[in-house]
Each structure stands twice: as C-alpha cells, then as structure tokens.
Amino acid sequence: MITRFAPSPTGLIHLGNARTALIAYFAARSSGGEFILRIDDTDVTRIKSEYVNKIFTDLSWLGIKEDLCIKQSERCELYANAVVKLKESGRIYPCYETPEELEIERRSLLARALPPVYRRKNRPQHSTRLPYYRFELDPDRVVIWEDKLRGKIVIDLHSTSDPIVIRENGTYTYMLPSVVDDIECRISTIIRGEDHISNTAVQIQMFEALGCTEIPKFAHMPLLKLQTGKMSKRAGGNEIQTFRENYIEPEVICLYLLNLGSKSRSTFKNYKDYSNFNLENYSSSSSVTVLEDEIYSLNADFLRLSNYEDLARRLGGVSKTFWDAVKNNVKSIPEVNYWWEICTTEAKLYPGIGCNAQLVRDAISVLPQEEVSRETYRRWVELIVENYRYDKREVHINLRLALTGKVGGPEMAAILPFISRERILIRLNDSLS
C-alpha cells in the first residue's frame, strides 16, 4: 500500500490533519508499503514558507517519517504536460468571465429555480482578458466507488460545476495537480476527510481522462470536531504546536488520535506495533468529538506509566526517588522539574498568602527533631491535630501553602522528605513574616 499526506502550508497542522497523517502513515507501515509527504504549495497567494518548516517539525515530533517528500511548486512541468493532454482531448477549456459576471449568472439561474451550475457552452473568447481554465465533467455519468470505510458511494455530478483547474494568473488549483501526483507517485490508497467526498467524484473523472488504469482506493474519515464547534486552521487552538508548547508528549497525541473513532483500543505499549493496525476498524460516523481534557489526562497517565530511565535525559537533575515520589501527581515533565526546584533549592516562594498564622506557629512548636520522612510527616500532622484541635484537612492545606507556596500538587508526605528540616523551619518562619 502506498499512501500520502498532502498538507497545504497555509496554517499550522491541527489535530484533524495530524490524525489523517497518522492513519495514512500506519496504514502504509502495516502493509509494508510507503508513505509519501506531499506539500501542496501551488496557491502562492496563501502559502507561507514558515508553515512548510512547521509541517516538517510537527510530523517529526509525532514520529512520522516519510519515504519520499515532494513539493508541488517543483512539479509544474508535470502538471503542464497533463494540461496539454487534456486540452488535446477537449477536457480542459478556457473561460473569460469575471467573478462579478459569474455572480450575475449564478443569481439568474437561482431566480429561474435552476441549480447554479457552470457548464461548457458557446462561451465567447475575450480579446483583452486572460483566460482561466476548467475541466469538463461528464454530468450525465454517475460516479461510483467502493469506499474502504463507507462502502458503496454514489455521486451524481449533474449539479456540480466544471471545476477550475488553472487560475487566471497561471497557477494551479488543488484538483488537477493532486491527481497528477497520485498517478505519478503510484498512490494506492487515499485517506482523507469526508469533506473531500465530492472532490473524489470529480477527481475520479480526472484520473480516467488522464488514462489512469488503476485509480486509487479511497477512505474518507469522519471529521474531528471540538466541543466548541468545527475544527479548522482558521479557528486555531487545536494545533500540534500548541500541544507541544503545553508539554503534551508526542506519544499521547499519537495514541489519542489513533484510538479516536476506532473499534480497537491500543495502549502506550502496543500502539507502535504496526501489525495491530487495521484501517477498516475506523468508524464512518458523521463526526468524532475531541475532548482536550482527555488529552491532558492521558498525558498524566503516560508519565505515571513511564520508566525513569526513558525520561531521565529530559528530567535534568531530578533523582529517580523524586520521580517515583511525584509521577502519580503530575501532568507534565516541566511540572516535575518545577516541584524538584521547590523541594531542593532556595526557590522563591510566597508562602504567607492565605496561611493561618497561628496554625503555622503551632506546627513549628511540634516539628519533629529528625529529618522529615513520610512517617514523620504523618506523625507531625497528627500532633498538630491532637494538640491544637485543628481539622486535619486544614493542617494539610496550610502546611502546603507555607512550605511550597501552592494550594495543590504532589502528595505532601511524598515530597517533604526532599525538603531538609532546616529549610522546612525557615519556610515556616518566612510564612509568618
């Protein structure tokens, strides 16, 4: 199987793009095939070079390694050859209408209760205007294909306009170059969102017009949506870059997206085993909702299940004993580093805010003489409760505030052994000043 992922560098890759890339990548690898990355950069008015670089960064971060990378901007000669062939066969024709004239025609058709469809007619040449070009569809032919996820799909193109393939400025639209590249790269399976179903019907006619005898198989995935609505580059907030900057692990994004909408459930241990992957396990339901809270929760699970040795390089000087003490109560690696700094250095705290000063004084009066361990911390809390009649929860909250400057975090009994008794006493007194 040869698959491809074809992002357009007009924005950052979001979760929906990444899911398509991952599924196409795993489909290729599970079959022993090839995965091709194609940069769709023909629309010079919208693309930005910075987004090209970020596509590579995001895919590399996700562990996606292409077998071949092509850029459409470097393949225009191939497209020009295809255009010559289609002109010779009469399937591409010039048009001269301005956008304003097309809008007038559209309104006229609607006013007569007719579909606003652009078809080839005896359209006059225009001596002073540059032409743009359309591909002539066969409107009387119903396009049928067997989708790998949705089964039989039937599209009637009677109400579809002939698509524009070359703009007035000579640049290509998405439709034709995509087909030319799929033929030239021998793509066997095209995996993409369900919003491309109508494009597929049009492109099947393009494949045929170019003499392609082995048209790729298609798998149209349900679109991802957020709880707040549709996912898109324009809406933002769900980009891979954003999750990376928020310290979500790449394994978490991969596992979450690969499991989303699938009948089978992979784990961190086995999701990279390509032999477990089956494209047909994915649902063809109309949409799949992304719950960002689940991603952050899954990140915490990943850290909890990770071995110290696997993360040691990224943990800096954090000791294994500290990692084991806090890993069940943190959601990101920077959070581990943060708590390590609080516990082992003279970190700048603001512990006095919100503390019960009398409780802190009472806590100082019964602070054990030995270095604090899990057991001595529990005994210390019990002494404060028994001697001064405080609620145990209140004691925990105030000790946490005084000693860490925070209202939440890892279990106090787990982290206090990493704060020396001397530092504990200093912080308790500082919280009173």
Swiss-Prot record:
InterPro entries xref list: aa-tRNA-synth_I_codon-bd_sub2 (IPR020751), aa-tRNA-synth_I_CS (IPR001412), aa_tRNA-synth_I_cd-bd_sf (IPR008925), Glu-tRNA-ligase_bac/mito (IPR004527), Glu/Gln-tRNA-synth (IPR000924), Glu/Gln-tRNA-synth_Ib_cat-dom (IPR020058), GluQ/Sye (IPR049940), Rossmann-like_a/b/a_fold (IPR014729)
Intervals of motif 'KMSKS' region: 230-234
Gene3D superfamilies: 1.10.10.350, HUPs
Ligase listed as a keyword: yes
Any GO BP: glutamyl-tRNA aminoacylation
An example Gene Ontology molecular-function term: tRNA binding
Example of a GO cellular component annotation carried by this entry: cytoplasm
Catalysed transformations (reactions): tRNA(Glu) + L-glutamate + ATP = L-glutamyl-tRNA(Glu) + AMP + diphosphate
Keyword annotations of the record: Aminoacyl-tRNA synthetase, ATP-binding, Cytoplasm, Ligase, Nucleotide-binding, Protein biosynthesis
Major subcellular site: cytoplasm
Annotated compartments: Cytoplasm
EC number: 6.1.1.17
Binding site for ATP: K233
Motif 'HIGH' region, residue numbers: 7-17
Claim: Cytoplasm is one of the keywords in the record: yes
Subunit and interaction comment: Monomer.
Family note: Belongs to the class-I aminoacyl-tRNA synthetase family. Glutamate--tRNA ligase type 1 subfamily.
Role played: Catalyzes the attachment of glutamate to tRNA(Glu) in a two-step reaction: glutamate is first activated by ATP to form Glu-AMP and then transferred to the acceptor end of tRNA(Glu).
Protein name per the record: Glutamate--tRNA ligase 1
UniProt organism field: Neorickettsia sennetsu (strain ATCC VR-367 / Miyayama) (Ehrlichia sennetsu)
